[in-house]
Swiss-Prot record:
Protein name per the record: Cap-associated protein CAF20
Gene: CAF20
Gene Ontology MF, one: translation initiation factor activity
GO biological process, one term: negative regulation of translation
The organism's place on the tree of life at top rank: Eukaryota
Alphabetic keyword roster: Cytoplasm, Initiation factor, Phosphoprotein, Protein biosynthesis, Protein synthesis inhibitor, Translation regulation
Length: 219
């Protein structure tokens, strides 16, 4: 970066000082006056057009006075009675269906609970939803009840099977069958949706036919 002394800066200032020229300044002032006059003429012409348009609409529709000023576009038509009317009522904008941008309050939303301990510390606890019973204390209680019921049913089925035989004992157990709608998804199965079905021995037609053949041979 170039460095200058004070004497050099004063010399440069004298050399590059601006000297206004009177002919250029007068031409510039005349141009400004012409622009102002042109803008004033345009404003007067616009006001005259607006007044003529309002008067034409007021006469054609039979409306005069302040009520005729609301029709400013000048687009009119002849109705079935021969009167000239404006299209103003056809250009009205429909009201918005989004409640004018205002969001409706969500009354069903539950607030978070605040727990204050002895030291004064506040802890926010999330609200547990009713349909999510597998989370929280209610879900743990339901799980424990379901396990107890399954274990009790399986124990009784095993005891009955020991007295009747190995085949009947295996058939007397309890098998947990999950809900079919959740098999193809990664969502965890809710214990309340699991149906416990007790196995029963099905009827075999081939075994029945073989038993009849043996009885016929004995006869």
């Amino acid at each position: 970066m170039a460095k200058y002394t004070e004497e050099q800066l004063f010399a440069i200032k004298e050399e590059t000082s601006y000297v206004p020229q009177p002919q250029i300044l007068s031409a510039f002032n005349e141009l400004i006056e012409q622009v102002k006059e042109h803008a004033h003429q345009q404003q007067l012409q616009y006001q005259q057009q607006q007044q003529q348009q309002q008067g034409f609409s007021g006469i054609g529709s039979g409306v005069s006075g302040p009520g005729a000023q609301k029709w400013r576009n000048g687009d009119t038509y002849i109705d079935e009675h021969g009167h000239e009317r404006s299209y103003h009522h056809m250009n009205r904008r429909r009201p918005s269906r989004s409640n004018n941008g205002e969001k409706k309050p969500f009354f069903n939303k539950k607030k978070t609970e605040v727990v204050v301990d002895e030291d004064g510390w506040e802890t926010f606890t999330p609200v547990q939803h009713a349909h999510r019973g597998s989370i929280g204390e209610d879900g743990s209680e339901e799980k424990s009840k379901f396990r107890d019921s399954v274990s009790g049913s399986s124990g009784s089925g095993a005891g009955a099977g020991a007295g009747a035989g190995a085949a009947s004992g295996s058939a007397g157990g309890v098998r947990a069958r999950p809900n079919n709608k959740n098999l193809g998804s990664s969502k965890q199965v809710d214990p309340r949706q699991i149906a416990s079905t007790k196995q029963t021995r099905t009827f075999n037609a081939f075994e029945a036919l073989e038993g009849n053949d043996d009885e016929d041979d004995d006869e």
